[in-house]
Amino acid sequence: MPIQILPPQLANQIAAGEVVERPASVVKELVENSLDAGATRIDIDIERGGAKLIRIRDNGCGISKDDLALALARHATSKISSLEDLEAILSMGFRGEALASISSVSRLILTSRTAEQSEAWQAYAEGRDMAVTIKPAAHPVGSTLEVLDLFYNTPARRKFMRTEKTEFGHIDEVVRRIALARFDVAINLNHNGKLIRQYRAAPDPAQHERRLASICGPAFLQHALAIAWQHGDLNIHGWVADPAASHTLSEMQYCYVNNRMMRDRLINHAIRQAYQDRLNDAQQPAYVLYLDIDPHQVDVNVHPAKHEVRFHQARLVHDFIYQAVTAVLQQTNAPILNISEEGEVDAPRWQQENRVAAGTNKYAQPEAAKSSAAEQAVARERSSARERAAPAYKEDHPYQKQQGELYRQLLQPSAAAKPATSPAAIPASSVSSPSIPVQRITQAEEPLHGDNYSFGRVLTVFPPCYALIEYQGGVALLSLTVAERWLKQAQLSPPEEGLRPQPLLIPLKITLDKNEIAACQNHEKLLITMGIELSVEQGRATLRAVSLPLRQQNLQKLIPELLGYLSQHEEISPDTLATWLARHLGSEHEVWNVSQAIQLLTEVERLCPQLVQSPPAGLLQPIDIKAALATLTHE
């Protein structure tokens, strides 16, 4: 059979296989279109579980007569127009496939009117070529979509539909999820002429618990702990259930990314990990969580139904969610959200602890106790689709500006360097947290000027690990592995408050001998100072967190070696231990390239500026260019 272009109806039916799984899929797509249109009221009418009729009526902005025909065409949308728009999506829909796909497997009628039009217009597509017919109609400002006889022309799909009760149950669940995402929108759900759900609009944050109770039930609300956490462009708020009550609330698992309902495995894993020590294998956590993130940092165009997303910084997002949920669950005597007759909610007492992966817990401040948990949980919710606009996300994160300021300070004549004689001479600084300032060297012997703070330009790299650089008017070979060791020494030298522990994605189980167990107990404070969270029970250790420089190491091998080293010393300083660790950590690169060398030297110049003026043995070897030139010229 020769290659041929498929007719529009067949092409749309193929696309419908991905978009339209069952009546609930139709409801989801159409209601999301209403939300994108700025609707504040949506009425949903269902007959026979959606097999006979699905009607969605809204008071949104409507569709003009000139755009009605395009609305039913494939790949036609008003929500994106360029690749840049696709990379920063905030609207619910964007592909322009839903209406065309639905109309190809049903009898779809679209009626709409804009505020500028004096009358409404109705459109429907029919025939093999999906030709669109438009005629005048009576309708207020907004749109109504009627989907009749779903799958009437695809008997195989219709045969796989479940009972009326089952299909309506799926529709009810979709509406529940959407109602939790948009508190500011009133939603009514009718089945066979009977009002089943009525979710009144709750624009006031103090009223959000009312809708939460109507959707998730009073039992969830009574055991809910409010959460509100922020780090840079990441923000999470919502509610998590007390683990003691999770066995009765396991079905309550709702998560949203930029107000889009999700069933993402990374998010579920982070939440499950936060609960793992509080629930058995048969129990599931209960939660309603909202994650707001820079739309440039998340790709929603990876799943046909948009149920999953891909985060550009998946580990950061995972650790952020894990730490936020863990901090709330670790509250001692955390009160439940108990609604009084006046609708007031008692504020929980927040734990004074927050690791770098999760940012600063702004609700650990004394004044936070004066505000209600409801206000905390929804302080950053967007009010409506019309008012919601893409935030002006900054290109540089705050910590990058802070590091840049520190970098400029190093160029000032007032900064000074001390000659490096041993690894212990490296300044006690840490980069495991962007918020920890780099400590300057106070015992100055020679000022560090902007002209001589740098090693010089990297010319090339000789495999596996030597960089040829411009140095003091000549050239020199620099050992990248030695420079990396000095950098790790600086990163591992703890400040007064210690290194910040970074939680592992999965806690590591390690078997120890008696000497290693004794070393773990004797040097517990030192390990905490180094950002290592290690607990021992019945001869087995559980490693839960390490400082940032250790995250990429082979911890299964490194930790027993570290404890073996500690068992040989009764007392040891953090700087000495940092020196030992720096010499035992594996290199991140077997063979270096120019870009990796430039990145490494930039970090070394910022954190270890004293190495530039007084390079230690083994780091730098100048090359005598004059001798080479003399040989070439036979002088």
From Swiss-Prot:
HAMAP family: DNA_mis_repair. It comes from the Bacteria. One of its GO terms (biological process) is mismatch repair. The keyword Metal-binding does not apply. Residues 378-399 have a biased composition (Basic and acidic residues). Gene3D superfamilies: 3.30.230.10, Histidine kinase-like ATPase, C-terminal domain (3.30.565.10), MutL, C-terminal domain, dimerisation subdomain (3.30.1540.20), MutL, C-terminal domain, regulatory subdomain (3.30.1370.100). PANTHER family: DNA MISMATCH REPAIR PROTEIN MLH, PMS, MUTL, DNA MISMATCH REPAIR PROTEIN MLH1. Belongs to the DNA mismatch repair MutL/HexB family. This is DNA mismatch repair protein MutL. One of its GO terms (cellular component) is mismatch repair complex.
